[in-house]
């Protein structure tokens, strides 16, 4: 299974090495994000490959290159920040129960791992056969959370690409994606419920919409900035679109006019090989816009003229009024319920009446403010507009409509009253102290 759905292939033809994809105009709708991965190989997988750490390392690097290729459709660059092989013993108890193992791995990351290394998302690769033939599991929307920014994946196929699809699928869940439904018209795409005999390297339009909505509502902080070269574990084969220690440029193709494929050094006369501020092997002139402002809460960045990199993505201070005082800036966006309703239910949607939100004081699976130890915590009366989002249609204002997924909760930073916003604990807090 993938996340509890049956695996249905018997064989798979050898796949060609993943090729690099150029960004399409469609991908420009997503802001650039960077995910630093920590990969942990359990002792069972170490034993499976006869203790050959070099073979395992090469296999993991190939997986990362495939993941990076697939994530380009979301304008995400993935880097291997940490690779740890548990050659002596497992550092957690890897059980046949996938939910239990995921919980243990998340707790270990929060209490042990984050104290000794920096990364954004951790995955455990295991040889353990999980109950129900599950091959992967991850929390939906857990990215950047100390305990929930994790996934577990069984090394279930000899073909690297097939396992990499599963790893990308689980990371997709962490980024807010749910399984593709029938209406998505893509039964082989990355977020499909079932991993097909020939899995696709593409995200469906449904997945892209989910990611865009979730990114707008949450704007994960840990994946905003590009990794340093010293943050990246060097790969045996270059051409991964990442600059690693010792490289001037990424030497993936001998045809690259800026970069010498044999040495990963710049060709004579070249200032740069790639980057938002690199044009025809030269630094773009100072003042050239390299990242447009995506909202009135964001700040456009311009090239400095001395580097190929676009400056760090910056934005106006949190709490600054926006959209004619209908909202407050939060991490470069202006989250308001009206636009969240449109994202969920279309252009005829608007915010539901105040009475709809009173359901959030029930403490139900769908109507609550928080969840603690599997118990749903009801919203306090003053916090009901920070729980489940209720919408309606302009032609039927008495309707209380909601989306029961994670995307259906009111986004953090959303205005819940005059001078107040929803904080990370789903409380309607003073805008001056909420962040």
From Swiss-Prot:
The record's section on Gene3D superfamilies has:
Collagenase (Catalytic Domain), Disintegrin domain
**Which residues does the propeptide include?**
1-26, 228-243
State how the cofactor is bound. Binds 1 zinc ion per subunit.
A Pfam family this chain is assigned to: Disintegrin
Tissue occurrence = Expressed by the venom gland.
Q: Where is the Peptidase M12B domain?
A: 33-227
Q: Name one GO cellular component term.
A: extracellular region
- Entry-linked InterPro entries: ADAM_Cys-rich, Disintegrin_CS, Disintegrin_dom, Disintegrin_dom_sf, MetalloPept_cat_dom_sf, Peptidase_M12B, Reprolysin_adamalysin
Q: Could you tell me where this protein is found in the cell?
A: Secreted
Q: Enumerate the cofactors the protein uses.
A: Zn(2+)
Its chief place of residence is secreted
- How is this protein activated or inhibited? Inhibited by EDTA.
UniProt-annotated catalytic positions: 170
Q: How is it modified after translation?
A: The N-terminus of the metalloproteinase is blocked.
Q: What class of enzyme is it?
A: hydrolase
**EC?**
3.4.24.-
Protein family according to the UniProt entry:
Belongs to the venom metalloproteinase (M12B) family. P-III subfamily. P-IIIb sub-subfamily.
Q: What does this protein do?
A: Disintegrin: inhibits platelet aggregation induced by ADP, thrombin, platelet-activating factor and collagen. Acts by inhibiting fibrinogen interaction with platelet receptors GPIIb/GPIIIa (ITGA2B/ITGB3).
Q: What is this protein called?
A: Zinc metalloproteinase/disintegrin
